[in-house]
């Protein structure tokens, strides 16, 4: 790499170009700009990240140091992780992309990479693990399976955050010498089209200190300057040696926050390890991470307008888990907390994030000198497994459960559990104020008929040629072609946080691209008052009414 002179603060604050892309492209963009070796193996929903990186290198696109990243496709995710491990030991800047079972195959190498304090970032489109059945859709089961590897873990909630956190994790890994899993929700974020601000090269360069690169190169294994690494240790030293990583993990939360602050100064987008939104005197707080936090923030904003004392806390840095920063972010008025996990750990007495929060607050109270004199009531819940919908009505049900005299702990929301009765009841027709200012559209098509591609182009045109914000999410099953696709599009003058589908009675525009759907689906049930319905049909204007189902 060629060292470059750091640009001035004024140059760094240059206007950022707005583009309309999905989460996978946002992560791949930063990864390609900040790495030299990219090991890939395809797995849904992370495959587009590797495909884009491969395409860009084939086109000769360069990273910020003027080199073209080398793309290596391996025989499996285990091979990709092994290649990353080898490349980083040789002093290269390296990354990979994966999800689900692919991440599980990387775990053996991840322990070594973390134990050797190697600055790698793995970008994960978080996806369900195969249990009673396989699912290609999103939850946090895979990243939670890797939480004990020693990798730091940074979560993104939106497409814009994917781009931003990809850069922040890359900088933090080099600065703090810990590898990162940067994860975001599979499909809900990885495949959502959204209008974002593109981070220009000068800001990426400003975030990556040349001294960190020189130090990383200096740790490369080379026969010219031999050192020993990766030995076999006996009981006399292994325990002591294992504890030597402690200072790096203790320092990492502060390092990440410092890099977030630097990023805010360059872009105007500010982040915290734990970001609170809500009433300053909130009594009920929901705590979670991932795309669901967007819908919770939208709902909290609505409830604040009705006088509710509620709030929400989104977790960004999950590992190392900083109890200090968590407690700083929580209002002192908090009395009831719902911790929502997007995973299930069978046999455990609670899901991972829930247990971390309970431990942090219990230790604070037990110290006698902490923020809370009495332990708030903390309830754990599961939501959104395999991309199950997480709507405003469900979020209100969680807040309602916090108010209940006989509150349900270790609950589920979003399903009807008639076996073990863990589920909360919710109102399916609940709406937020934010939805009233958004134009919502639905398009029904068949896989490979061009509907999804056309809608992506529509979103790009409106997002990039007007001042409006645009969001597109596309619902289809695991079949490659021929299945029904439903495109959910939203357009608004303000940022869109609705990380859930367009519901019945909400669509301002409905496009039916196959006449057979009229016999199969109640399409007009989705229409809002005064909605426009567009039918793609071979029938003439005179004959079309006779073709409609009676």
Regions found by a protein language model. Name each.
Residues 49-54, 83-86, 106-110, 131-137, ...:
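Short acidic, glycine/serine/threonine-rich loops at helix termini
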Residues 55-60, 298-312, 363, 461-468:
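Short helix-loop-beta junction
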Residues 336-432, 550:
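Peripheral docking tails and interdomain loops at the edges
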Residues 280-308, 321-328:
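Redox- and metal-dependent alpha/beta enzyme cores, enriched for Fe-S-associated oxidoreductases
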Residues 17-20, 320-321, 336, 340-351, ...:
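Active-site cofactor/cluster-binding pocket
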Residues 136-186, 210, 359, 366-384:
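Conserved thiamine diphosphate
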Residues 65-69, 180-275:
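Conformationally flexible catalytic loops at phosphate/diphosphate-handling active centers
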Residues 10-145, 150, 167, 392-393, ...:
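Thiamine diphosphate
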